[in-house]
A protein has these predicted regions:
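Mature extracytoplasmic or organellar-lumen-exposed domains after removal of signal/transit peptides
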Residues: 1-330
């Protein structure tokens, strides 16, 4: 990545900026919240509620742990009072009026801005088919209320069960938000395969002429961007502490270790610090992988927003998904 040109490796189709940033959201935020603060730190013998988090702290161990997880979620403190479009536009800096909850004329980036997966949730919710943002944020608020109501005493078994129930709501919906992103970017990769092919004419991957070459390189750049986002989000699904088993294996094989390039190559591993590549791959076959991936997100994760849907309009979907020329990557 360090040797690439501004984070872009044109030979292998890697956009490291997108790949690393999207995976970091999952590998840090989602992982820390769902495999740490909302998991073992909610156990009776971990970060007790009848003791300060640390010497001099005015909050308990449980309060700190729950609040830390909420911070990783990334929602504005007043986000639950806004519509999905308002929350989405706040992050896009298109609606600073609604971001300024206390009306002091400035936006507090700590409490009045949406970040990370909360932003993506709002983006999916504004389509009207889901309510991820409010479901997760309300579960955070309700779980925190249980901890607050304990008034610095140990949580009872019933209180702890309630807290863990809200934690499950948070993490199951958070997983679906990430799965929605996988669905979305699988659709983007699918579309950009067609865009790349459209710049190749009858010369396969050999593009001549300055204008044609520029168009081809621009299409490849966007293709790499979307694959990087897809790979980052799909890898994130592995980080909650829940073993995805065969579903995860299938997802990883469909995404691949890199996108299939116009010359039929695709990264398939590393040796002595350098990428190894397979040859003879098909971009058309990889496009079918993206359809299979969208179908997997529907069947196994129950995504409902389905932004950038490429499978609903295919009348012979079962036939396409069973295509023999799109065998999954080994």
């Amino acid at each position: 990545a360090a040797a690439s040109e501004k984070g872009y490796d044109a030979m292998h189709g890697y956009d490291y900026v997108q790949l690393v940033s999207k995976f970091t959201m999952g590998g840090v935020f989602y992982h820390q919240a769902c495999d740490n603060y909302l998991d073992e730190k909610m156990n009776a013998d971990n970060k007790p509620n009848d003791k300060p988090y640390k010497d001099g702290a005015y909050y308990t161990g449980k309060e700190h742990s729950w609040d830390e997880a909420f911070g990783y979620w990334g929602a504005a403190a007043h986000g639950a009072t806004l519509s999905p479009k308002q929350n989405y536009d706040i992050t896009k800096k298109k609606n600073m009026r609604d971001a300024d909850a206390n009306g002091d004329g400035v936006v507090n980036l700590k409490s009045e801005m949406n970040y990370a997966h909360a932003y993506y949730a709002a983006g999916f919710d504004k389509g009207g088919n889901t309510d991820y943002y409010n479901t997760i944020t309300k579960a955070f608020i309700d779980g925190r209320q249980i901890i607050t109501d304990a008034k610095g005493e140990k949580l009872s078994d019933a209180q702890r069960r309630g807290v863990k129930r809200h934690a499950r709501t948070i993490c199951s919906n958070w997983e679906k938000v990430i799965a929605e992103a996988v669905f979305k970017y699988a659709g983007s990769v699918y579309s950009n395969i067609e865009a790349v092919k459209a710049t190749m004419g009858g010369n396969l991957w050999q593009v001549s002429g300055s204008t044609a070459k520029a168009e081809h390189e621009a299409a490849l750049r966007k293709y790499a961007k979307y694959w990087g986002e897809l790979a980052g989000f799909s890898l994130s699904l592995h980080t909650s502490g829940v073993n995805l088993g065969e579903i995860g294996v299938k997802m990883d094989r469909l995404v691949g270790m890199g996108p299939v390039m116009p010359d039929g190559t695709q990264v398939n591993g590393m040796s002595n610090g350098a990428y190894t590549v397979a040859s003879g791959k098909s971009m058309d076959g990889f496009a079918v992988h993206m359809l299979k991936l969208q179908n997997l997100m529907v069947e196994e994760f129950g995504v409902e927003a389905r932004n950038n849907d490429k499978i609903s309009g295919i009348s012979n979907l079962a036939e396409v998904l069973g295509s023999g020329n799109s065998a999954e990557n080994d």
